[in-house]
Amino acid sequence: MKLKITTAQKIIITLLVLACSVAGFMLKLPVMFRHHDKEMHAAFYFVAAAFFTLLFAGKNFWIHGFIVAALATFGVVIEYAQEYSNSLMRHRIHGRFDPEDVKYTVMGLLAFSAIWVAYLLGAWLFQAQPKSSEADSDQ
């Protein structure tokens, strides 16, 4: 069964996910998760790249590249927003800008991109191979 999603539905889904992501990133992590912050950045952006690539790009390399660039930019903007939010509030609601978070954001994006490109190459290689029954029937 193939699920058909309209462009308007994709945009609504994207805006909802974006709003939840911003809200989630602007809150301070509970104590039990603070030592896993870097891994959570990598995992979140890995899943986000997979989600948006499946939603918008399919097998289009350029759209995937745009998605990865947009998510990387989002990651940097969120880090700056976290730092800025601390200066707006009377109490600290989040940590400081952390270049390590940006590093792990990029690592998560690159990890998904590597898997996605390997999948596309594998699909292309196996699709390009003629079936043995077709090759035998041509003779």
What are these regions (language model features)?
Residues 1-100, 106-139:
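Bulky hydrophobic segments
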